[in-house]
Design a protein with these regions (language model features):
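DNA replication initiation on ssDNA origins
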Residues: 1-84, 200, 204-212
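DNA replication initiation modules
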Residues: 2-16, 73-96, 130-213
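Short, polar loop/linker segments at the starts of domains and inter-domain junctions
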Residues: 21-29, 100-103, 186-193
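Hydrophobic, Leu/Ile/Phe/Ala-enriched alpha-helical segments that form helix-helix packing faces
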Residues: 42-52, 105-109, 151-159
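Short, charge-rich binding segments
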Residues: 77-80, 104-106, 114-116
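Short amphipathic alpha-helix segments
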Residues: 95-111
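Short beta-strand
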Residues: 113-119, 164-169
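Short, conserved phosphate-binding/catalytic loop or strand-edge motifs used
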Residues: 117-128
Length: 213
């Protein structure tokens, strides 16, 4: 799995994706000195209330597409493939909770990647999923919205914390931040979803969390 190809961008304003292996993303988070410098400066400027300077550092950090691969852009029309990955974002966690949340998500067998976000107060999670019953006519964008909701509800229950629902779009990018303790599990267990059951479950669902395995 470490050779899975992903689309990475030099920064949030970049529109030309570069294909890299998943293990290169992990290496950047763990070892890249330029990313470490941006992360340190962002946290310093933010602590001093210098929002513009902090935003400049964040915008300069690389970011990668979690759910899809892109070609020649980063719009929905530029999607060239699907990774089988989804994202959970726990940002601005209550004081002292980030370490606890990180430990819980790292211990879960579904977690492929977990790292502390650039704020230093959040945790980003990447996990795998499989779709049973998929056909060439399957609407992958609609399916991803369903997958995202179920996966995020699962991790929300696991941690007892709120997730960011704004990350539901398949084209959403995940910004990198330096984390020497980044967690990576090559053989992570995928969530499995049956497409027909998932569609049927959507209509009657009203605040009920569906069990996923």
């Amino acid at each position: 799995m470490n050779k899975m190809m992903l689309s990475i961008f030099k920064g949030y304003a970049d529109t030309m994706p570069v294909a890299v292996c998943l293990d290169e993303v992990v290496r950047l988070i763990r070892e890249d000195k330029v990313l470490a410098d941006h992360t340190e400066k962002y946290r310093y400027y933010r602590s001093q209330g210098q929002k513009t300077a902090a935003g400049r550092e964040k915008s300069a950090c690389p970011c990668f597409a979690v759910a899809v691969r892109f070609e020649n852009g980063k719009r929905k029309a530029d999607i060239s493939g699907w990774t089988g990955l989804s994202m959970v974002d726990f940002d601005h966690l209550p004081e002292g909770r980030a370490g606890e949340v990180f430990e819980k998500v790292c211990a879960d067998p579904h977690t492929v990647l977990a790292y502390t976000t650039i704020s230093g107060q959040g945790v980003r999670v990447v996990c795998r999923y499989c779709l049973d019953g998929e056909t060439p006519d399957t609407d992958r964008v609609a399916c991803y919205s369903r997958v995202f909701r179920r996966v995020n509800e699962y991790y929300g229950q696991l941690t007892g914390c709120s997730f960011d629902p704004a990350c539901k779009n398949a084209t959403r990018l995940s910004g990198l931040a330096h984390d020497a303790q980044v967690h990576y599990r090559d053989g992570a267990e995928p969530f499995r979803f049956d497409l027909s059951r998932m569609k049927k479950a959507d209509e009657p669902r009203r605040g009920r969390v569906e069990r996923v395995v």
